[in-house]
Amino acid sequence: MNARHFLSMMDYTPDELLGLIRRGVELKDLRNRGVLFEPLKNRVLGMIFEKSSTRTRLSFEAGMIQLGGQAIFLSHRDTQLGRGEPIADSAKVISRMLDAVMIRTYAHDNLTEFAANSRVPVINGLSDDLHPCQLLADMQTFLEHRGSIKGKTVAWIGDGNNMCNSYIEAAIQFDFQLRVACPAGYEPNPEFLALAGERVTVVRDPKAAVAGAHLVSTDVWTSMGQEEETARRKALFAPFQVTRALLDLADKDVLFMHCLPAHRGEEISVDLLDDARSVAWDQAENRLHAQKALLEFLVAPCFQPA
């Protein structure tokens, strides 16, 4: 299969990733000026959801429509994927009928197996390992507000989860330093840490992580599929709540990001999203624009007239 996929930030070169977020800025400007731009007319994106979603579904579906194409929502409950059809078989059929596939799933191996058997581009809409589309939006948001992130310091506060893993990949590809503050036993995947080398430092003190940082980011303490751990995680992660006082230790021009949905009063203080340093709403909107840039990059242009 010769299709180009987007399963990880490491699938592309740094120049390609920078080009994508710059293109996201351009597409956002076109949208804001009311310019009609439909390079993907008559193209169809399939969206396979094993995990529930608000931002991922809205941004991909609206983005594909705005680019002139269409999007089809497919849940495990409504397809043979949920009844045990092998992933490889499903991929071979689905990719003959669509022009691209976005998958939001649990096991990352589901994505890699689907992509290995797909004729068309496969996009990681989220897996337990990675959330690369969110990082495109985050990097676009930083670019819009502060310019290049190269050489800057980023602090990740909380669970070493899929978002944290993607921040590690972004640190490599966009050349910034990343400090991860998490409780013992909740570090990022060692494979990602090994890949990053000296670009990533793991600490136990959130104050040490945030000191002088140009960007501070966090996520929920309990991800989907971990609900039984909620009480224990709340107790362990309580010292890692991001507050206005914690942000005061960062660079004077620091930005705060959260991929949402946020649990106010848990990983962030109740008032943090309303702080002037928070760009979470721009960050959420940029899922739309960054992913439009990705779709434009991956999906072949419109068909020629017969």
From Swiss-Prot:
It catalyses: carbamoyl phosphate + L-ornithine = L-citrulline + phosphate + H(+). It is an enzyme of class 2 (transferase). L-ornithine binds at residues 162, 219, 223-224. Pathway: Amino-acid biosynthesis; L-arginine biosynthesis; L-arginine from L-ornithine and carbamoyl phosphate: step 1/3. It is found in: Cytoplasm. SUPFAM superfamilies: Aspartate/ornithine carbamoyltransferase. Gene3D superfamilies: Aspartate/ornithine carbamoyltransferase (3.40.50.1370). GO terms for cellular component: cytoplasm. Keywords: Amino-acid biosynthesis, Arginine biosynthesis, Cytoplasm, Transferase. It holds the Pfam family OTCace. The keyword Transmembrane helix does not apply. One of its GO terms (biological process) is citrulline biosynthetic process. Its EC number is 2.1.3.3. It comes from the Bacteria. GO terms for molecular function: amino acid binding; ornithine carbamoyltransferase activity. Carbamoyl phosphate binds at residues 53-56, 80, 104, 131-134, 259-260, 287. Reversibly catalyzes the transfer of the carbamoyl group from carbamoyl phosphate (CP) to the N(epsilon) atom of ornithine (ORN) to produce L-citrulline. PANTHER family: ORNITHINE CARBAMOYLTRANSFERASE, MITOCHONDRIAL, ORNITHINE TRANSCARBAMYLASE, MITOCHONDRIAL. Belongs to the aspartate/ornithine carbamoyltransferase superfamily. OTCase family. This is Ornithine carbamoyltransferase. The gene is argF.
